Amino acid sequence: IHGGGFEHGFSTELEFDGEAYAKKGVILATISYRVNVFGFLYDQKQEEELGFSGNQGLLDQIAALEWISENIAAFGGNPDNITIMGQSAGAMSSHVLTFSPLATPMIHQAILQSGSIACFPSPMVFTKAQAQAVTDKFYELCGVSSIEELRRLPAEDLLDKSDELMTLYPSLPFRPVVDGHVLPDTPDVLTKEGGMAHIPYLMGVTKDDLFIPDGASHREGGFFTAAVSFANACRKQNLPVYLYEFCHDLPGSDDGAFHSSELWYTFGTLNRCWRPMTDEDHALAEEMVTCWTSFMKQGDPNEDVKEEWKAWTEDGCFIKTFA
């Protein structure tokens, strides 16, 4: 599932290609879903009419998951061995779905790259009241008072106004909503109750990921802290979690191992990249694709690897480094 802060993004980015996976016996399906105001606008009156509102983008993802579950066998796939995988907002989406009763029966492994729905000082979800406050401000910017009036405006106008909204809410004004339908409760409550999908997880960060507090080590905040916290909760449920850190600086860049830089390697699509990739880069990509596809096939990344990738435990913490 692609990222983009729930505001933009698409499923056909250059990194997303399944050739390397297919060579190792894995079928890749990339999906599109509604984003921005079209995917995550919550309206209380709409909820009263339909029974739900605010998670249209997540419902798209669930519909795609249902289609894959029903049809993947026709492509040679196994509907009883589906791995959900996402990066950034795509990882947050994937994480939400591992808490959703609408999706968990169809998910057998989860890969969360640089994203967790609980990855900040507070969960990256809105309560209905918080979501409605954002919606009310958006209606004000658009000069309307209801969702019916909003629907009469051109889509281009809505996107322009959403850009204005983002100046008022710089940290993801559109995000998943705790609606009691897709998401039964807040992720922190569900995690404490053991309400996550009881499956293997593979999750991690890049060395220079986003959202790091000023002056703090990347291991003191943001995505990393969330990954460790969730891993500890999973261990209490005897669920295997494999943690990693991507530390490889991309060639031709001074930005280090920045947010999303690992995608070329986890998909094995270096030949599509404009950067001056070396033999070292290709070897790293092969290692990561091997680990990722091994996890997809058996819930364990250790098939045909040189060094064992140990699961996380509170007593013996292990983080796999890709450098």
What spans do the regions from the language model cover?
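Bilobed periplasmic-binding protein/Venus flytrap-like ligand-binding cleft at the lobe interface
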Residues: 97, 288-299
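Short, solvent-exposed turn/loop segments enriched in Gly/Ser/Thr/Pro and often Arg
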Residues: 34-37, 85-89, 244-253, 307-314
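Substrate-gating cap/lid region and adjacent catalytic-acid/histidine neighborhood
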Residues: 109, 117-124, 141, 145, ...
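Mature extracytoplasmic/periplasmic domains
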Residues: 302-323
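Serine-hydrolase-like catalytic core of hydrolytic proteins
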Residues: 1-144, 191-211, 234-236
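Signature tryptophan residues that serve as conserved aromatic anchors
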Residues: 67, 292, 309-312
